[in-house]
């Protein structure tokens, strides 16, 4: 039996701890905050329980289906027909199907057809290997052309990746387009899923299953340092003392790893430090009426500093479909850690 410490109780940490506990290991899960779940945790938004960050499920998320079944919550999965929009030229356009693409006035007909080629190639491709060494700009330009990249992708990349927009991997954009592109009921109808009760349903099931398997969840207990001896983990230091450990799984952001494990070889520290990170500040609005009929709206309008909005209640009903009910809209604002706003306080 391995004494394992998992650091971070977001969905990844919870799932790793749950798997390890069910495999018979002695697992302690550390969480710096006072609730488990990370970005999947819910909070009370003026009487409404809602997740900190939006989540959705696609029809090809087979590992998720397997996990839901093992947790006994597969019956909480719901599917809904959703749509996309695109805001540009001061107008909201339909998006996400062949007819909408052909009707879109913001590109030449040839560019619209080539945009469709990028989408088609992405949804049909099964392997990412050859894309790992290509930038998204190179790949999209090769298949879609300069007009497609400059008008449709570059504005989104600039707002999401800033200085990293140009070298971002083609494998990233392919994975994203493929996942959404294959989650369809038909060529003309997108189909996305959610959990009844929100992501809290998954968080609660993982935490309860972890505890029943003998796991120990310690909230408000940050990991301060991973101790090693002879190149092997011996424990994790917390404000309450040291927890003996034979192995550690960290789900903390990679820039924190070198500080967390001071005995790491210098070349490993350099590898972790070299990984660029981008943060996100996600605003959540609770409104009395719907903003658009769409779940997701991409924005390529000059002067608008966000790449899109997510009208979450158009996927998971939270009162937005009833008269006088609530509409929940997430507005993500991305920024690299070098951005001046990244250093602002939460207040």
Map each language-model feature to its residues:
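Conserved Rossmann-like nucleotide-cofactor binding loop
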Residues: 12, 35, 255
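Active-site/ligand-binding neighborhood in enzyme catalytic cores
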Residues: 107, 116-226, 251
């Amino acid at each position: 039996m391995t004494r394992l410490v998992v650091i971070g109780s977001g969905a990844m940490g919870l799932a790793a701890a749950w798997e390890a506990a069910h495999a018979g290991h002695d697992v302690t899960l550390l969480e710096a905050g006072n609730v488990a779940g990370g970005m999947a945790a819910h909070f009370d938004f003026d009487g409404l329980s809602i997740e900190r960050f939006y989540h959705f499920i696609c029809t090809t998320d087979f590992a998720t289906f397997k996990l839901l079944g093992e947790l006994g919550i597969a019956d909480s999965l719901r599917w809904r027909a959703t749509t996309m929009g695109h805001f540009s030229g001061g107008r909201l356009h339909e998006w996400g199907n062949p007819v909408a693409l052909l009707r879109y006035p913001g590109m030449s007909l040839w560019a619209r057809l080539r945009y469709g080629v990028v989408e088609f190639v992405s949804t049909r491709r099964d392997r990412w290997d050859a894309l790992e060494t290509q930038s998204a700009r190179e790949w999209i330009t090769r298949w879609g052309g300069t007009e497609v990249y400059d008008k449709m992708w570059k504005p989104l990349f600039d707002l999401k990746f800033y200085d990293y927009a140009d070298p971002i991997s083609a494998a990233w954009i392919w994975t994203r387009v493929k996942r959404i592109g294959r989650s369809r009921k038909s060529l003309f109808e997108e189909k996305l899923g959610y959990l009844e009760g929100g992501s809290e349903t998954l968080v609660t099931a993982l935490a309860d299953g972890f505890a029943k398997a003998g796991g120990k969840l310690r909230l408000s207990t940050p990991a301060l340092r991973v101790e090693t001896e002879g190149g092997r983990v011996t424990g994790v230091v917390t404000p309450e003392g040291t927890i003996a450990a034979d192995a550690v799984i960290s789900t903390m952001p990679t820039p924190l790893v070198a500080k967390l494990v001071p005995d790491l070889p210098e070349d490993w520290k350099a590898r972790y430090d070299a990984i660029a990170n981008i943060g996100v500040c996600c605003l959540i609005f609770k409104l009395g009426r719907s903003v658009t009929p769409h779940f997701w709206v991409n924005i390529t309008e000059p002067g608008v500093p966000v790449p899109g909005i997510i009208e979450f209640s158009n996927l998971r009903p939270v009162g937005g479909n009833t008269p006088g009910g609530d509409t929940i809209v997430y507005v993500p604002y991305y920024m690299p850690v070098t951005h001046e706003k990244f250093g602002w306080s939460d207040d």
